[in-house]
Amino acid sequence: MATDRLTRVHSLRERLDETLSANRNEILALLSRIEGKGKGILQHHQVIAEFEEIPEESRQKLTDGAFGEVLRSTQEAIVLPPWVALAVRPRPGVWEYLRVNVHALVVEVLQPAEYLRFKEELVDGSSNGNFVLELDFEPFTASFPRPTLNKSIGNGVQFLNRHLSAKLFHDKESLHPLLEFLRLHSVKGKTLMLNDRIQNPDALQHVLRKAEEYLGTVPPETPYSAFEHKFQEIGLERGWGDNAERVLESIQLLLDLLEAPDPCTLETFLGRIPMVFNVVILSPHGYFAQDNVLGYPDTGGQVVYILDQVRALENEMLHRIKQQGLDIVPRILIITRLLPDAVGTTCGQRLEKVFGTEHSHILRVPFRTENGIVRKWISRFEVWPYLETYTEDVAHELAKELQGKPDLIVGNYSDGNIVASLLAHKLGVTQCTIAHALEKTKYPESDIYWKKLEERYHFSCQFTADLFAMNHTDFIITSTFQEIAGSKDTVGQYESHTAFTLPGLYRVVHGIDVFDPKFNIVSPGADQTIYFPHTETSRRLTSFHTEIEELLYSSVENEEHICVLKDRSKPIIFTMARLDRVKNITGLVEWYGKNAKLRELVNLVVVAGDRRKESKDLEEKAEMKKMYSLIETYKLNGQFRWISSQMNRVRNGELYRVIADTKGAFVQPAVYEAFGLTVVEAMTCGLPTFATCNGGPAEIIVHGKSGFHIDPYHGDRAADLLVEFFEKVKVDPSHWDKISQAGLQRIEEKYTWQIYSQRLLTLTGVYGFWKHVSNLDRRESRRYLEMFYALKYRKLAESVPLAVE
């Protein structure tokens, strides 16, 4: 009788040795092709392209063996003849390195530091010697359990609760940290949960049972004030709830925890404890305001994200404070840069109330040097020398505004995150990090060849700031799994910081671990007062239709729109983004220009860049020049419309719906997109959406069901997919409705601001609690980070030239 038996998992080296002996000639043929490319780096798609060029018979032999598996998992190949080194990623977050001598067919397995040293020879011609600074954060987390399953990535708080609840509640003695936390928890000197009448865990359980018994005798709606004095006498303060029913639920949750600890119950209980009253959100760069700024340099989705986030957060904070029976007024402050030269915006105003809120404001603090306040806009790539002084100034302003410390500091993007790290360190406050986009992923090979890009982008400074912030923070929220750990075939933004090198500066052998429980996926949504389905006719903003008609179809060409649409009966494919290389708007225009069938089926409308004024952004200037060239090369006038960036979000919402009325589609063609807010906006309006497979949109959209994935590196295939869709719709119009409805359903399930704000506040409570009762504040690594900041980051920041006024 056959029996199942466990077999040893062979190492990468063993598997390769077996394949080498079986398929020596085929492997030699492929590696010789790769070596023949000469000194340099081949990305995953280039390695696969070389593989596809070898004879089919050889290809088939390799496909089924261990070498085929290695090849499919290879993210990059380093060629330094006669050696070829491979960075192999069998699954997200797991890396192995090897190199092969093509002439001798000798295989060596490398450690990360050895691989990086080999890679550095591309730049230096020889290694930097034995005394290069190597950064390794792994020892600081070695004693702390970490998940190993892919499904745990981005679910850090669940893992943390499972591990620490078992540890914390295993006997009476271990309950003292919880008791201390509940006794010390206060706001503005007022104790919120327990007073000093409760001295030990036994007394706590006794009091909770006594309170439970009493609450069972009063009507559920009885206000807390009716029994406040009675509860205070036995040791309970007023943070348990606003009425008898709510207080009873909270008490029973804690009793359940003390009886039989459970991670879900723990999270629910901690989510009820009122911990967050003052929130500070940092976003220094760009033009941060509520009107007339979208489309300005460095000003796009991040501004929209934060404003929507703040409205949702304030609502949830008010709701929770009320439910817990407290009369505390929350505050949310968005900290950004004050721009004296505000260029027709409110960016020169110190304090500005956030529309649609009661207690949230934008607080602007200027950049300052020893010569005074910096007046002009500065690119996000050049802010580094100002941020340390800026942090001190922000701390001073916060003390004035809040009359105390915030409960949560949220950083946004690289500059906001390093300021958040410095502030959280100074004030001892829980820190949350939101990257939005890590530039190292957006600019391939920007680490190894950083010196070539340094004058323009100062990536050495930015990557150092990113590494510092992601290791300093208490928790990181991302919009998608891909942002953390990519997909089967692509590397995640954070994952790309696992091991990398900046030759001549430092070598990162362990920068971040994507399995770290600090990672949590919390996806945002679109503002549903602005973005709603085109079929909701009673809500449609018809007052904008004349203006939108002018934008899309006017025969006039001016600074706001050029080129005309001659056939108004055709559906419109539409895109809206900043005009930069990564957003790849000119790429979409080129795909369209080259595909005669697509041009026959649909018109193309692009909202990008601002032709009404001269851009200060070098990338935008280059992309504008390219756009004019494409219009001329492909004779696009008549089928194409280029509209300057549109600042009015409310009208933009109706613009999406008007495009949907034409039975068109939204296309997001970015080379890489961290999340894809415009994708969510378009889908929320019911517009079928085609979006990049690189980054967040790959998770937002279920391919072929709620939209379509496109590969920006294969524009011809993307254009063919659009042709296929519109030809199908021509034959069967219900196909358009089917994709539209599935997109709407997908948004309702996962991408709303209400879900987001509930999750963010719960995470803050959980991580704040664990910091108090455990060693989760990572003191050892923070001392290491202080040294890294002082000895590396500060010098790099000082090397960035100050702006010329």
Swiss-Prot record:
EC id: 2.4.1.13
GO BP annotation list: sucrose metabolic process
Gene Ontology terms for molecular function: sucrose synthase activity
InterPro entries: Glyco_trans_1, Sucrose_synth_GT-B1, Sucrose_synthase_pln/cyn, SUS_EPBD, SUS_N
This protein's record includes keyword Transferase: yes
Region of interest (GT-B glycosyltransferase), residue spans: 275-752
Catalytic activity: an NDP-alpha-D-glucose + D-fructose = a ribonucleoside 5'-diphosphate + sucrose + H(+)
A Pfam family hit: GT-B_Sucrose_synth
Highest taxon listed in the record's lineage: Eukaryota
Cited NCBIfam families: sucr_synth
Protein name: Sucrose synthase
Organism whose genome encodes this protein: Vigna radiata var. radiata
Underlying gene: SS1
